[in-house]
Amino acid sequence: MLPFRSNIAAMAGYVPGYQPPDVASWIKLNTNENPYPPSPEVVKAILAELGGDGALLRTYPSASSQVLRETVGELFGFDPAWIIMANGSDEVLNNLIRAFAGEGEEIGYVHPSYSYYATLAEIQGARVRTFGLTDDLRIAGFPGRYEGKLFFLTTPNSPLGFAFPLAYIEELATRCAGVLVVDEAYADFADGDALDLVRRHENVVVTRTLSKSYSLAGMRLGFAVARPAVIAALDKIRDHYNLDRLAQAACVASLRDQTYFAGCTRLIRETREWFSAEIRTLGYEVIPSQGNFVFAAPPDRDGKRVYDGLYSRKILVRHFSDPLLAHGMRISIGTREEMEATLAALKEIG
C-alpha cells in the first residue's frame, strides 16, 4: 500500500461543475462562465506574443508578472507591492491556507458558499469550521472574537447570489483575530466591493478572478490585494512561474479594455434582472443576485426534477445535493437568447 498522508487518503476531493465534451451543442449555464468572448484585444495580444513563429515560448515568462501587477494597480489604485498575480484566484486561496494555517489549526467559512475552501484546508491538514446563515443573510453564531487563522467570506455569495453589506464585512474584519479573506470572484457584477478595506485593515485580503467578468476562465488568471507583508509571504510560496506568457499578455490586454468589459457586465446584469423577474412570474423563488447567476427554486421545491428536465433539453445548470440547496438550482446568466430558451424550457417543464 502506498504511503499517502492520512488526510489525503481520507478526503473526498472537490467536484467541479460538469464540462460536456460536446459543449457547443449545449446551453451551458452551470459554471458561471461569461457567455461573451473576451475582448478582441486579448486575441491580438496573444498573437503578438507568439510573434509568428512562437519563438518566445521557449523562454520562461516574467516570474513576478510585474507588468500585470502594475496594470492591476493602476486600475484599482494600489501600489504593485500590494498585489500578487495567480493562476486563478484558487491559487491565492490555496497559498493563503499554506501561509497561515498549519496542521490542526482552524479556518472558517460560511456554508453554503465555495466548498473548495474545505478541500484546500483538508490538504493542509487544517481544521474546518463552518457557519450558517440567518434569515436576514448574516452569519449565524459568529463569535465576538473569531480565533481561527483564516475566515473566508464569499461575497457575492455563490451559489446564493446575495452580497454582504460593506459595513458588515468591516465589522467581521474587526472580529477576526486572524485574516479575513474576502473572495470577490463575482464583485464585478455587484453594486460595490470591499477593496478599500485592505487600506483600513491589515488583516483583510481581497481575491479576484478574471474567469467570470473578463471571459478568461480558460486561461486561469486571478489576483489578490493585501498589505505588502502578506503579499511578500504569499510570494515566497507560489510557483515562481505561475503565469505563462500568453496568460500574462491576455490579462494585460483584457484589463486595459475597460470599455468592452463594462459593456459585457452591463449586458449580464440586465439579463440577470430580466430573467429573475420572468421566472418569478412562474412561481419561482429567486434570491436577488449580485453575481452572474441566480439561485432559483421552483414552486414545488424540487430542484432535481427541474434540473433533469433542463438536462434532457441540453440545458445545463447546477444542482446541489446538499439539503440546504437541493430545493433549487444555480443558473448562470447566458446571452439573452440562451436565457429566453431556458425560460421557454422552464415553462414546458412546469
From Swiss-Prot:
Cofactor list: pyridoxal 5'-phosphate
Superkingdom per UniProt: Bacteria
CDD domains: AAT_like (cd00609)
Coiled coil spans: none
Residue ranges of the TM segments: none
InterPro entries: Aminotrans_II_pyridoxalP_BS, Aminotransferase_I/II_large, HisP_aminotrans, PyrdxlP-dep_Trfase, PyrdxlP-dep_Trfase_major, PyrdxlP-dep_Trfase_small
Metal-binding recorded as keyword: no
Top EC class of this enzyme: transferase
GO MF term (any one): histidinol-phosphate transaminase activity
Keywords from the UniProt entry: Amino-acid biosynthesis, Aminotransferase, Histidine biosynthesis, Pyridoxal phosphate, Transferase
One Pfam match: Aminotran_1_2
Keyword presence, Nucleotide-binding: no
Pathway: Amino-acid biosynthesis; L-histidine biosynthesis; L-histidine from 5-phospho-alpha-D-ribose 1-diphosphate: step 7/9
Catalytic activity: L-histidinol phosphate + 2-oxoglutarate = 3-(imidazol-4-yl)-2-oxopropyl phosphate + L-glutamate
The protein's Enzyme Commission number: 2.6.1.9
Positions carrying N6-(pyridoxal phosphate)lysine: K212
Single Gene Ontology BP annotation: L-histidine biosynthetic process
Family under the similarity heading: Belongs to the class-II pyridoxal-phosphate-dependent aminotransferase family. Histidinol-phosphate aminotransferase subfamily.
Subunit structure: Homodimer.
Family annotation (PANTHER family): HISTIDINOL-PHOSPHATE AMINOTRANSFERASE, HISTIDINOL-PHOSPHATE AMINOTRANSFERASE-RELATED
Listed name of the protein: Histidinol-phosphate aminotransferase
Organism of provenance: Geobacter sulfurreducens (strain ATCC 51573 / DSM 12127 / PCA)
